[in-house]
């Protein structure tokens, strides 16, 4: 084999050609003389056996076409020296014969290439078994219920626990009765009387124990049924929270009810004051002039203004003066003809609620105020006070002209009109 052929074939190999071959690339390949049939076949067979594996790239070996053996020996299509191979620029090592123009074109092609992005692969929930999913959901619900019930433990007792005072629970829980130790039973929202509430009455606790109820029977039924129907299948903490919220929403501002008169109060202190003043029969503050007793010192101070002659509250419509601002407010209802309180029996309307209640005793015949001396009963407390002066002989109303005293104010007015000619 001539030396010139080996040199030309070596130069024509892709290892020694630039990345951007010139226009005479195919021309040089065509000028290579083809060997004879017998000689060429032997040479090609020998070269195919002797060709080292290092001269072929890994990509070219993997992407080798199946019909390469059937291709013509002079064809470069699909071979390593094919200039249009898509793997040419990735595996070919740099050559010192690369021109600057070709380097610029190569850099431009790399700059224009799209950035490499990682493919997003969503997590397949189907990979988990059904039991695993149920376990995760149940664990989350239990954690949520515990977090929500943790804040309620500051306000709502859920059962008799060691180390807690018995006064925080109802009487059944404190005495170990039927309601003791029941989980989910709120000592605040329950219908039973709390020991702490009864402790507010002091000496009047035994007498006022039957007058205390929280909440009312109807309202308690509402919130209990509501809580059990909506939250029966939930945890204890959520149930306690729902019952407490339902109690606040349904009962509103007033949730402490007096059983005797059905009056509702928003705080236990208000109920305690009401029981002490109205139903306990004990009024420790007495007026020195008329002997009238009161449950609070503030009420006594307001009452003392009745005995004074000063009238500092004047009506701007008729000019009438009053000793109390509350009396003036009641008087102004007369000028406006506002009677918002009707009688449920006869329909007669009144300015004040107290006047309406006094009027209803006429229809019912009820006389709740009884004299302790003679046993006579009255429908109004004012009539009982006036009657008690007959037994004591006390005459708080005296004439400033003659000094004569009277038990009732109306008797003094009549005396001034008839005896002294004053109106």
Swiss-Prot record:
Region (Disordered): 1-76
Subcellular location: Nucleus
Primary residence: nucleus
Zinc finger C2H2-type: from-to: 256-279, 285-307, 313-335, 341-363, 369-391, 397-420
GO term, biological process aspect, one: negative regulation of transcription by RNA polymerase II
A cellular component annotation (GO) from this entry: nucleoplasm
Name used for this protein in its record: Zinc finger protein Gfi-1
């Amino acid at each position: 084999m001539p030396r010139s052929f080996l040199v030309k074939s070596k130069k024509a190999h892709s290892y020694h050609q630039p990345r951007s071959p010139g226009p005479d690339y195919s021309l040089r390949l065509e000028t290579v003389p083809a060997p004879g049939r017998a000689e060429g076949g032997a040479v090609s067979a020998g070269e195919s056996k002797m060709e080292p594996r290092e001269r072929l790239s890994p990509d070219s070996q993997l992407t080798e076409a199946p019909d390469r053996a059937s291709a013509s020996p002079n064809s470069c299509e699909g071979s390593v020296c094919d200039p249009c191979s898509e793997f040419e620029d990735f595996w070919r090592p740099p050559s010192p014969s690369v021109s600057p123009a070709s380097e610029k074109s190569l850099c431009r092609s790399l700059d224009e290439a799209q950035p490499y992005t990682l493919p997003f692969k969503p997590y397949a929930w189907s990979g988990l078994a059904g039991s695993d999913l149920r376990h995760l959901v149940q664990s989350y619900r239990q954690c949520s219920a515990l977090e929500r019930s943790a804040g309620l433990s500051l306000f709502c007792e859920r059962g008799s626990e060691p180390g807690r005072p018995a006064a925080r629970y109802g009487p059944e829980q404190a005495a170990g009765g039927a309601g003791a130790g029941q989980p989910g039973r709120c000592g605040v929202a329950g219908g039973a009387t709390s020991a702490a509430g009864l402790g507010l009455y002091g000496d009047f606790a035994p007498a006022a124990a039957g007058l205390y109820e929280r909440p009312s029977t109807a309202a308690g039924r509402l919130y209990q049924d509501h809580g059990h129907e909506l939250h029966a299948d939930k945890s204890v903490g959520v149930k306690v929270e729902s019952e407490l919220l339902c109690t606040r929403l349904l009962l509103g501002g007033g949730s402490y009810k007096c059983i005797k008169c059905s009056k509702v109060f928003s705080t236990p202190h208000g109920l305690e004051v009401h029981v002490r003043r109205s139903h306990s029969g004990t009024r420790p503050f007495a007026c020195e002039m008329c002997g009238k007793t009161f449950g609070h010192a503030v009420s006594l101070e307001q009452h003392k203004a009745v005995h004074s002659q000063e009238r500092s509250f004047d009506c701007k419509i008729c000019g009438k003066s009053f000793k109390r601002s509350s009396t003036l407010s009641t008087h102004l209802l007369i000028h406006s003809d506002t009677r918002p309180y009707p009688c449920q029996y006869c329909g007669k309307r009144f300015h004040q609620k107290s006047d309406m209640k006094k009027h209803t005793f006429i229809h019912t015949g009820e006389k709740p105020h009884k004299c302790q001396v003679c046993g006579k009963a009255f429908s109004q407390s004012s009539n009982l006070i006036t009657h008690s002066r007959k037994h004591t002989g006390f005459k708080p109303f005296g004439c400033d002209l003659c000094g004569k005293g009277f038990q009732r104010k109306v008797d003094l007015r009549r005396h001034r009109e008839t005896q002294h000619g004053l109106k």
